[in-house]
Amino acid sequence: MIENQNYIKKDFTTTKLAQQYDCCTFTDCNFENAKIGNTTFMECKFVNCNLSNTQLNVTSFKDVNFNTCKLMGVNFNDCNTFLLQFNFNNCDLTLASFYQLTIKNTSFISCNLTEVDFYH
């Protein structure tokens, strides 16, 4: 488990991620097209990061905030649904999918939600 770390301008596109991040902040990081599997993010913040087309196979997001991030084409329906909780502020979620997910406590503030799939 990695705790209380700040990552700035790090490229995670080819980096193998740890299994769990707790109270970490990712700023100006690139995850575009990365394969993030079986990773847990607890109380983390993503600020101005590119996560477009990232594959989230069984990834857990527990109380995670995304601020000014690109998340285009991300299939959140591949996430681990146990305690799933995240919020989005000023993010681009064009073509993202939350298909069959229960996201009642999720907020989308000033986000681009063009063609996002919220079908339940």
Labelled PLM ranges:
Residues 1-120:
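Tandem repeat scaffolds
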